[in-house]
């Protein structure tokens, strides 16, 4: 193992074919020069105050660190999916392509993909959910995994096809707009109510409209979910089997309130659970008109997620993230070759240690 000089750059002579690394270096230098040339009319490296060697070293280090971390995260996903394991390079490329249009990091996207695949959405379906979740994360100012958790929870609870992912994202964003909550809060608490609501036949738009109404009144998001869950169970006891078959959740609560005849004590007899009572009071009486209005808007939520994404993606911060993602994607050939070289060398050394033991 020695050191060789080639075109002013040093390489370890390990016996490993590093022609790919050399070509990757040449490609990276071309990319750096092209980008620098767009920025300054001076000498492409001198104009930004660094030498060509320093520029390459910085680019190489960044490309290597990115590829190492990204590969590790995607290999974690591959432990859950034989399909992804068998086409790992292709899926890595697909994830990177998403990040060239959506300002989230590839590593963040890979971590979210792990959650998505874990929730049962693999292959092309998983990638569809990932793209919707990444856009939702940008528009909702949260992380991709949190957005994915909310969307997959609803998909699974209501046994929906992934083609409904975008519609769910629209409804979640409409909840944020109408209520006093955030996408992150919804993502962390929607699982409290979704399975029960689905089991009793209460539709998603009705649940989310109720969340908007209750949180607008000042009820914390997690508590609103608890109230809705408790009221679904309680109302079904009062109205019997099929309580929600021919009426919305909001209409069912209004019927219970009607039976209470305006008496809070009678309401407590019908619905003993405190959280359930609070949901009835928060969605009927003086609040019934607003509750109905929120439900109507929820049923016309199409495009809400895309509008939020476009608004946030245009910010200077997110445009800089996108630029970073595009530069990283362009330098991946260099990062992959360095990682391959170092991994092969490390493997050879480990084998040598094992052989000598």
What residue ranges belong to the model's regions?
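Short, conserved catalytic or adaptor-binding loops enriched in Gly and charged residues
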Residues: 1-5, 318
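Extracytoplasmic
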Residues: 7-9
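Small-residue helix-packing and pore-constriction motifs in hydrophobic alpha-helices
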Residues: 13-17, 49-101, 111-119, 126-140, ...
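Preference for small-residue-rich
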Residues: 14, 18-70, 217, 234, ...
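Solvent-exposed, non-transmembrane alpha-helical starts
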Residues: 22-23, 107, 124, 145, ...
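Short, surface-exposed acidic
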Residues: 84-93, 107, 222, 263-271, ...
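Hydrophobic, often aromatic-rich secondary-structure segments at membrane interfaces
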Residues: 240, 251-328, 332
